[in-house]
């Protein structure tokens, strides 16, 4: 029906636009400026992601920045949920927010890798998986001191767990798209890290910038 189709298009546009511009807010840069720290883009990989923010302003403020990034993911999913748009639009909001974080319109379409934002979307979509990821993510980083490896393995674990829950608990099948899409985006945004991991030259989080 034309009315239904136009309504769906409008819902998709509203969801995607809100998610992109919210996801693009560069909290790593904002927090660093507010506390008078070094610019995250001036060190390491040159991205305002979690590892560079940690190096630039220390663990306390990096945690604040990471939680704010996660909040962006939460909001991107909650907007379509509160508007009653359905799970497919929650997935759209989640994936677009991840893209917005990594391709931010506010800083010349650069950005981080999307890990914190993706975790925030997962907190709303499936909190159990969000909690289960944390020991994997943290354990890998503690063991290797390599943030990117924790992100890659944590996201893969979360994606597989999400797919398993869809099959076992009858969750909406579109969450399979969310699982595969979010993992794919995180891995794509980590391609340079993957290359360095394979060469054995990836940066450790405890290395001085």
In which residue ranges do the predicted regions lie?
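N-terminal signal-anchor transmembrane alpha helix
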Residues: 10-36
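Multi-pass membrane catalytic core of lipid/isoprenoid biosynthesis enzymes
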Residues: 55-81, 110
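Loop-to-transmembrane alpha-helix initiation sites
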Residues: 131-133, 147-155, 170-182
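C-terminal ends of transmembrane helices
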Residues: 28-33, 98-110, 136-144, 191-199
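Cytosolic, membrane-interface loops and tails of multi-pass inner-membrane proteins
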Residues: 29-62, 110-111, 193-209
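Interfacial segments of multi-pass membrane proteins
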Residues: 54-57, 80-83, 96, 100, ...
